[in-house]
Regions:
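Conserved helicase motor
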Residues: 63-68, 144
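Short glycine-cluster motifs
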Residues: 82-139
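Active-site glycine-rich loop that binds ribose-phosphate moieties when present
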Residues: 147-154
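Structural signal for short hydrophobic segments within the conserved structured cores
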Residues: 6, 62, 116, 139-142
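Glycine-rich, highly charged phosphate/nucleotide-binding loops
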Residues: 67-76
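Conserved small/polar residues in nucleotide/adenosyl-binding loops
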Residues: 156-158
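Glycine-rich, flexible N-terminal cofactor/catalytic loop recognition
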Residues: 1-64
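Alpha-helical segments flanking ligand/cofactor-binding loops in enzyme cores
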Residues: 26-27, 77-78, 102-106
Length: 158
């Protein structure tokens, strides 16, 4: 296994792991002991889906959300700098795409650390695939706000 920050896609919903993630992903995941995650509980659940025998208590989790400072993120990467592979796990789908994982990737790249995205489901790409629209001119403007007034404003600006 190469030394890198691995971007680990997560299944969407209750989809069985083996129907959407290649065996290579499982191999990589089982070689990682340090994970930067959006939510520790859901990350632990995902890892147990990957391998029921995984020793969750032997793993280290670093929480990443909109409140995590760049300084904290930089510190999270210490195991990688010291020679241990790390993984980034989002709530669902691909980390770093319309996701706080993008901040981790940017900081890792500034530190000249290797970043390896793994194959997996992306709600954004799946929606384009199923839409019938031409993917050549696709543009993603981000997820719309939940608050109705903010959402209306966002739609006007688009």
């Amino acid at each position: 296994m190469e030394l890198a920050l691995y971007l680990l896609p997560v299944t969407l919903g209750d989809t069985p792991i083996e129907t959407v993630l290649p065996p290579y992903n499982k191999e990589i995941i089982l070689g990682i002991r340090h994970f930067i995650v959006e939510d520790v509980r859901s990350a632990r659940r995902f890892l147990k889906k990957v391998d029921k025998g995984i020793d969750i208590d032997a793993l280290t989790f670093y929480t990443l959300n909109k409140h995590t400072s760049p300084e904290d993120i930089s510190g999270y990467l210490k195991p990688l700098v010291e020679g241990q592979p790390m993984g980034v796990i989002s709530e669902a789908g691909c980390p770093a795409v319309a996701d706080p994982g993008a901040d981790v990737v940017a900081i890792a790249q500034r530190k000249n650390l290797r970043v390896v995205p793994l194959v997996g489901p992306s709600s954004i790409i799946l929606s384009v695939m199923g839409s019938g629209f031409n993917g050549q001119s696709f543009a993603f403007h981000g997820y719309l706000p939940i608050e109705p007034a903010e959402r209306a404003l966002s739609l006007i600006h688009i």
